[in-house]
A protein has these predicted regions:
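Transmembrane-helix signature of polytopic, membrane-embedded enzymes
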Residues: 6, 106-127, 144-145
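Transmembrane-lumen/periplasm boundary regions of multi-pass, lipid-linked membrane glycan transferases
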Residues: 32, 36, 42-53, 64, ...
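Short hydrophobic/aromatic helix or loop-helix immediately within or flanking a transmembrane segment
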Residues: 60-83, 93-97
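Short periplasmic/luminal acceptor-recognition loop of GT-C membrane glycosyltransferases, typified by
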Residues: 63, 366-415, 421
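Short acidic/glycine- and proline-prone juxtamembrane loop motifs at membrane-interface regions
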Residues: 88-91, 129-142, 182-183, 307-308
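Transmembrane-helix motifs of polytopic, lipid-linked glycan transferases
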Residues: 93-115, 149
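Membrane-interface transmembrane helices that cradle and orient dolichyl/undecaprenyl
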Residues: 112, 150-167, 177, 196, ...
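Specific aromatic-rich, kink-prone transmembrane helix
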Residues: 142-159, 170-174, 293, 317-321
């Protein structure tokens, strides 16, 4: 029977690898160049401003810390790459590095056979934890990678009888998560409760002190942009206080719009709990990841603020650590665990409602504006060419217009700009003397009127986003 189990696992691995080879090109940027999502454009802008000497804390980011900006500045400095020259692929490389670290977590599990570790890592890599945003230029991938590694390092340092100071490495990983988003403080509280219930013996004063020191060291360093922005700690405090208003539904509440994904995650976690109960045995530190994942899910389920990105942590905890540990044992247990994790990942992909994508033709906007600028400056060599954007949720326009001087809002020279972007609220095009009006679809449900100085004709092409 054991031999049959090995053969079955081998066949599962072969099927998986073949699928990987067939489908991997579908994720290639060469076939479908990626478009920057609005939230990614916000993070790009904040990181660019920070690189230009603007303290991150003055941006009043309501949700996130500067961890992504610090990491991006470091990588771009090492590569000699300027923010204005960065492509979407360049930006997404930053969270990709952390996603690779996340995929490596199953390989570091103890008490799990190597074939199962490898299958778990490959499954996570292949389906991106059932989430399309694992490679996005956002904070969530850094947060989840830091937190999951913190859980792993804490458990390994305790289970292997290492000195107390090894817990400091877990704290450092948690510090990364804390500098990404204040919600990490709640996650840490849930993990502490899980340890109290499952593995209280690991919570010694010395280990806790070392973990706290590591978290404070890395968290403060990142939150202050490597100790150059002392107000970053104050900003984190403001975000923490504000988080209670968000949690209570009194500020920035997002209602549930994708129940299918939440149901899929809830059923998956419930099945893992049932599997753990069927295994019986006393509670141990190996149960802490499952308890933490369930706690995080229930935490967000109880609060009015709902977005699928909030489930990235419990999903990754379950796929990196929980199911491989529960599946270890007989061949049928391993096969059932792998099949269940694969099925959940595929169901997640099918049920997860994707964001409102930026229209593909926006990639051609810089080329169109650049050609118009050349003609306009030839006709008006003594005047300054600039773009004015007034109103609306205009992201990701700043990224695609980064080669031009752009002003936002109602500034004195906005009405005289050679190129003006106005929010389109109805089908009646504005008639402004001295301008020709075009329509621009930024993304579904979001259109702009683009006004161009009529002293210079626009050379339109078939791929122009202006209609």
């Amino acid at each position: 029977m054991a031999r049959l189990g090995k053969i079955l696992l081998f066949l599962l691995g072969v099927v998986f690898l073949l699928d990987l080879q067939v489908r991997f090109p579908e994720r290639s940027d060469l076939k479908h160049p990626p478009r920057l999502h609005a939230d990614e454009a916000v993070q790009w802008s904040l990181a660019k401003d920070a690189a230009g000497g603007v303290p991150y804390s003055i941006n009043e980011d309501k949700f996130h810390g500067p961890a992504l900006a610090v990491a991006t500045r470091g990588v771009f400095a090492a590569r000699g790459l300027a923010f204005d020259d960065a492509t979407v692929a360049d930006l997404r490389q930053i969270p990709f590095y952390f996603f690779v670290l996340l995929c490596a977590v199953p390989l570091c599990l103890t008490g799990v056979a190597w074939p199962m570790r490898l299958l778990a890592a490959l499954l996570l890599w292949r389906v991106a934890a059932g989430c399309y945003f694992g490679e996005y230029f956002i904070q969530e991938t850094l947060l989840v990678a830091g937190f999951v590694w913190g859980v792993l390092l804490w458990l390994r340092s305790a289970d292997e009888g290492r000195p107390a100071w090894w817990a400091g490495f877990a704290g450092m990983a948690f510090g990364l998560a804390l500098a990404c988003k204040v919600t990490s403080a709640a996650y840490l509280g849930l993990f502490a409760l899980a340890l109290v219930w499952c593995a209280r013996d690991t919570l010694t004063w010395r280990r806790t002190a070392w973990a706290a020191a590591g978290a404070l060291g890395v968290g403060v360093a990142l939150q202050t942009s490597l100790f150059t922005d002392g107000q970053g700690l104050v900003a984190w405090g403001h975000q923490f206080v504000r988080s209670f208003a968000v949690a209570s539904g009194n500020a920035d509440t997002l209602p549930l719009t994708n129940p299918g994904y939440w149901v899929a995650v809830g059923v998956w976690l419930a099945l893992l709990v049932v599997a753990r109960l069927l295994r019986r045995g006393p509670r141990s530190s190996a149960d802490a990841p499952l308890v933490t994942a369930v706690g995080c899910f229930l935490f967000h389920l109880a609060l009015p603020y709902k977005t699928p990105w909030l489930l990235f942590l419990p999903v990754c905890l379950s796929l990196t650590m929980v199911w491989p540990l529960l599946a270890e044992g007989a061949w049928w247990s391993r096969a059932a665990g792998f099949a269940g994790a694969t099925a959940f990942s595929l169901v997640s992909v099918a049920n997860l409602e994707e964001h409102t994508a930026t229209e593909a033709h926006i990639e051609n906007l810089p080329e169109v504006v650049s050609a118009y600028r050349a003609d306009w400056q030839a006709a008006h060599p003594e005047r300054l060419f600039y773009v004015a954007i007034d109103g609306g949720h205009y992201w990701p326009l700043p990224y695609y217009l980064r080669a031009f001087q752009v002003g936002y809002g109602d500034f004195p020279a906005a009405a005289r700009a050679p190129v003006r972007f106005l929010v389109r609220t109805d089908a009646s095009a504005p008639q402004v003397p001295g301008y020709r009006t075009y329509s621009l679809l930024l993304r579904e449900g979001e259109r702009y009127w683009v006004l161009l100085d009529d002293s210079v004709p626009l050379k339109k092409s078939a791929c122009s986003p202006l209609n």
